[in-house]
């Protein structure tokens, strides 16, 4: 069963994400952390198949974390979750190395998004079909 590291600074949102993944029966929640620093520490000593990253983290942004993961752990894909549905954030996330972007309004789409990314595809929330962005 693929294991997912959740990086989300809002504890209630992190709990909702973890519950969605657990209830799907398709994924194991390896850990839930609240900062980029905690995420990098977990990645150094825990095997995960995907990192689910909130774009707005304290101290180090989710986009910066995605770039760090891409550099240090290139075989582990990142999927960004965000309240922002603008091309600016999508483009920055994809350029940093994210393999997908999900708008928090589409949070229940997370299971589908994770599967697409684990299958090697790029996944974008349905809301993003209405905006223009640079494809990686």
Say what each PLM segment does.
Residues 54, 82:
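Active-site residues of response regulator receiver
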Residues 63-75:
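Short amphipathic alpha-helix used as the core "switch/output" element in two-component signaling
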Residues 58:
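The feature encodes the CheY-like receiver
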Residues 8:
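Conserved acidic carboxylate
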Residues 35, 61-64:
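Acidic catalytic/metal-coordinating carboxylates
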Residues 88-94, 105-136:
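Short, flexible helix-to-coil linker/hinge segments that flank and couple to helix-turn-helix
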Residues 32-50:
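Acidic, metal-coordinating helix/loop segments flanking the phosphotransfer/catalytic sites
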